[in-house]
């Protein structure tokens, strides 16, 4: 494998005079906020190989549509961030992605679990796994200490903490519903592994288990118990505003993704941030949300096919993953099967809190037809317009109709 990688890199080096006169390679992404970090990684790669790759991110809400238009028009980036599961597989199924199954290191350095989110129905691998994310309850350590609060071990204890804070005039949670994604991805999907194992999730996906059964009514019921502890103006608060609210000390906690840790613990805010997974109800096995977030894909129509494959091969090495781990924002968890966390990184601590728990990815990712309906039902529960039973029945009816197509 190392010999093949060396040959690929050597081929790139040999072609440098031509590359110097040709257009630079480009990389598409939905993470505009990572421009400096990813550019540093690409600069390191250029230092090693002489190949320049220009980072060209698109606003996250426009990325999927923009990328598809570019690929359809034959002007897509040479490399691009790939979504996982069905959304990412759709591009591969339409012939846009390099099949990474034969890229050196991909099958050797990533576990079957890591590759699952990037594997198409025909067994092809449509991207090199890059980073996973998790979902946590962030808490202000000073507020907890001042009020004699310890990290809760059960969901019931978590609700008691929220009630204690609210009684003292402290807003327990900064979360809102205006963004129409984080209430599902961060809040509900952070809760679900406490109720449903990965194996049980598959039974829901197939229709063997129903989305309005006792378990799902319980999940929606417990979600509804969080609503009294949201800010008064929760309907108009989006994810960015929730982060600012928590960062400025205007709430004691925030349920959000691991990717927000770097910002919340950074220089913009003067708070000491702790985190814990949403605890399971008493008597239930603790779960942990660990979701493969994105990989790096190669454009099958790139004018620089060998350079694309060489970069993907580099990312699939331990050395490449170590370089990536140095610059990607705190809270993104490398998917390679090796310890590549930089010294002092929060990655090890985030992985540690998930040890021994029932880990699974975001529930809805193989049921994307339910994404918006889930958000709508959660928003309706928050506004007092829907009951947990009604939400479960609505979601189940939609999925049964989808399976019947």
Residue ranges and their predicted role:
Residues 43, 52, 145, 321-322, ...:
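Conserved C-terminal helix/tail region of periplasmic/extracytoplasmic solute-binding proteins
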Residues 126-128, 135, 159-208, 251:
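Extracytoplasmic/periplasmic solute-binding protein
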Residues 44-113, 117, 142-153, 252-253, ...:
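Extracytoplasmic "Venus flytrap"/periplasmic binding protein-like
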Residues 164, 205-235:
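Glycine-centered hinge/linker elements that transmit conformational signals in sensory
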Residues 70, 77-78, 107-142, 171-179, ...:
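A structural signal for short loop-to-beta-strand junctions that line the ligand-binding cleft
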Residues 28, 87, 221-304:
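Extracytoplasmic/periplasmic substrate-binding proteins
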Residues 89-90, 259-270, 281-376:
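C-terminal lobe and pocket-closing loops
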Residues 83-136, 150, 159, 165, ...:
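Hinge/lid segment of periplasmic solute-binding proteins
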């Amino acid at each position: 494998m190392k010999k093949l990688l060396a040959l690929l890199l050597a081929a790139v080096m040999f072609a440098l005079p031509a590359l110097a006169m040709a257009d630079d390679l480009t990389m598409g992404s939905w993470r505009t906020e990572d421009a400096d970090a990813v550019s540093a990684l690409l600069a390191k790669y250029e230092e090693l190989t002489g190949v320049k790759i220009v980072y060209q991110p698109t606003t996250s809400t426009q990325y999927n549509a923009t990328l598809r238009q570019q690929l359809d028009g034959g002007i897509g980036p040479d490399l691009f961030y790939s979504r996982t599961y069905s959304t990412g597989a759709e591009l591969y199924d339409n012939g846009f992605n390099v099949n990474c199954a034969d890229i050196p290191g991909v099958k050797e350095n990533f576990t079957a679990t890591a590759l699952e989110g990037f594997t198409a129905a025909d067994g092809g691998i449509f991207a090199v796994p890059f980073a996973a994310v998790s979902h946590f309850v962030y808490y202000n350590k000073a507020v907890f200490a001042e009020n004699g609060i310890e990290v809760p071990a059960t969901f019931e204890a978590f609700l008691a903490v929220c009630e204690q804070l609210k009684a003292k005039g402290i807003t327990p949670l900064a979360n809102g519903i205006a963004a129409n994604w984080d209430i599902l991805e961060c809040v509900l999907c952070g809760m679900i592994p406490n109720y449903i194992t990965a194996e049980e999730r598959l039974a829901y996906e197939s229709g063997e288990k129903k989305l309005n059964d006792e378990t799902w009514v319980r999940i929606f019921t417990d979600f509804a118990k969080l609503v009294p502890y949201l800010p008064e103006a929760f309907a108009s608060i989006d994810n960015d505003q929730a982060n600012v609210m928590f960062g400025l000390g205007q709430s004691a906690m925030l349920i959000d993704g691991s990717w927000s840790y770097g910002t919340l613990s950074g220089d913009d805010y003067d708070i000491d941030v702790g985190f814990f997974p949403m605890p399971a109800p008493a008597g239930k096995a603790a779960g942990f949300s660990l979701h493969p977030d994105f990989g790096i894909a190669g454009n099958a129509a790139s004018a620089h096919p060998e350079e694309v494959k060489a970069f993907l091969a580099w990312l699939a090495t331990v050395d490449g993953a170590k370089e990536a781990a140095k610059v990607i924002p705190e809270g993104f968890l490398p998917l390679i099967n090796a310890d590549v966390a930089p010294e002092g990184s929060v990655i090890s601590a985030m992985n540690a809190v998930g040890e021994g728990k029932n880990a699974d990815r975001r529930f809805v990712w193989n049921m994307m037809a339910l994404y918006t309906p889930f958000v709508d039902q959660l928003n309706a529960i928050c506004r007092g317009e829907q009951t947990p039973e009604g939400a479960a029945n609505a979601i189940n009816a939609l999925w049964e109709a989808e399976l019947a197509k």
